[in-house]
């Protein structure tokens, strides 16, 4: 049965009743390209949150990093110089919470002069590439909302001095949004209400955009993925890359030491023997406050969404179905009469995959302080 034939889908059917035949023909084509099996996750949304047995995971801490600095740095720089390292910047969001009706990365964070978030991130990257004497390919994930503005911003600022050939943009894949009964919302009479598929969808979106050929052509073996929010982070950090390579692990996560047991940050640990991230609200009081013999927290390192993944492993898990997180959100839509509704309270579900679930699909992961 086609989605528009389902009597339950009242928003789609109401829009079609208002449309002209040619509008419905185009709408049906779009509807047929959407994977509607995602709606099934509403019925089993609680199962995603069922967790296994957590156990602590030893981190590579600052004293060890300092003691092995030359070893880690050499291994990381060798990988960069050999063209084995790429980076992915997750930048699909708008700066709405920052009072900005533009891509978040275009925020001016300068004090005495203009300095944009995107600019600072590329400066951080160029600190690494200048020292290594080799460029790192940068793939920037945008969204339908901000893609054109993001590309135009980079063009306007001449890619902040970074070679244009080493920068590629791709759009994050979108999934439909629905009400609490699974009835798909419409954004307009001819467009389904769609939302980004979560930060765990970045590699799948790269594949869909045809960038796997570029990755193979460049010979990339490691991908450093990170979020746009943190202007201080070191990108393609040779010490981090080197520590991961030397450890023999197929992934690594940059972590920061928790300031307090109840700090609201997810911690890197193991779950049923595999690397995983326990969110702060999933941790029992006993877990949160447990300490080692030296007094340090047993679960003491929080993740900051800066990961290094083996490209080979990413391809191996690309076809695996990642857990779908059903998230209650406020979803603007048109009602059954075609009037725009902007809810003040959550009125339905969006469907997201999370990068933390990619970590759990790895065989091992090194926490790097």
Protein language model regions, located:
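Active-site-adjacent bridging/hinge elements
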Residues: 88-100, 179, 284-285, 326-333
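N-terminal glycine-rich phosphate-binding loop and ensuing alpha1 helix
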Residues: 3-168, 176, 185-204, 212, ...
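Catalytic core of tubulin tyrosine ligase-like
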Residues: 215, 219-224, 232-236, 241-369
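N-terminal ligand-binding/catalytic initiation module
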Residues: 2-3, 229
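Hydrophobic/aromatic beta-strand patches that form the interior of the parallel beta-sheet core
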Residues: 88, 107, 139, 168-170, ...
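Fold-independent oxyanion-binding glycine-rich loops
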Residues: 92, 143-144, 172-173, 208-209, ...
């Amino acid at each position: 049965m086609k989605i528009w034939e389902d009597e339950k889908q009242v928003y789609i059917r109401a829009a079609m009743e208002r449309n002209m035949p040619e509008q419905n023909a185009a709408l049906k084509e779009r509807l047929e390209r959407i994977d509607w099996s995602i709606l099934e996750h509403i019925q089993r949304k609680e199962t995603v949150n069922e967790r296994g047995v957590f156990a602590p995971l030893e981190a590579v801490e600052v004293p060890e990093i300092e003691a092995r600095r030359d070893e880690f740095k050499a291994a990381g720089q060798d990988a960069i110089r050999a063209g084995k390292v790429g980076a992915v910047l997750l930048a699909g969001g708008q700066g709405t919470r920052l009072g900005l009706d533009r891509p978040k990365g275009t925020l001016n964070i300068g004090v005495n002069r203009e300095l944009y978030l995107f600019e600072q991130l590329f400066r951080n990257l160029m600190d690494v590439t200048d020292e290594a004497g080799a460029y790192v390919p940068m793939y920037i994930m945008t969204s339908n909302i901000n893609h054109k503005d993001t590309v135009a911003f980079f063009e306007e600022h001449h890619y902040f001095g970074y070679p244009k050939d080493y920068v590629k943009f791709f759009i994050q894949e979108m999934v439909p949004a629905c009400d609490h009964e699974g009835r798909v919302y419409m954004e307009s009479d001819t467009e389904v209400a769609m939302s980004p598929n979560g930060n765990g969808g970045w590699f799948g979106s790269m594949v869909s955009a045809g960038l796997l050929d570029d990755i193979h052509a460049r010979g990339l073996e490691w991908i450093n993925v990170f979020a746009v929010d943190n202007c201080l982070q070191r990108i393609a950090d040779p010490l981090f890359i080197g520590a991961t390579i030397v450890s023999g692990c197929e992934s690594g996560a940059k972590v920061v030491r928790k300031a307090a047991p109840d700090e609201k940050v997810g911690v890197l640990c193991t779950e049923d023997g595999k690397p995983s991230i326990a969110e702060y609200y999933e941790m029992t009081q006993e877990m949160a406050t447990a300490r080692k013999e030296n007094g340090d927290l047993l679960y003491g390192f929080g993740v900051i969404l800066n990961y290094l993944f083996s490209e080979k492993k990413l391809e191996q898990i690309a076809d695996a179905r990642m857990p779908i997180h059903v998230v209650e959100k406020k979803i603007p839509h048109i009602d059954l009469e075609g009037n725009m509704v902007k809810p003040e309270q959550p009125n339905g579900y969006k469907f997201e995959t999370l990068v933390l679930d990619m970590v759990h699909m790895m065989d091992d992961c090194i926490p790097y302080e």
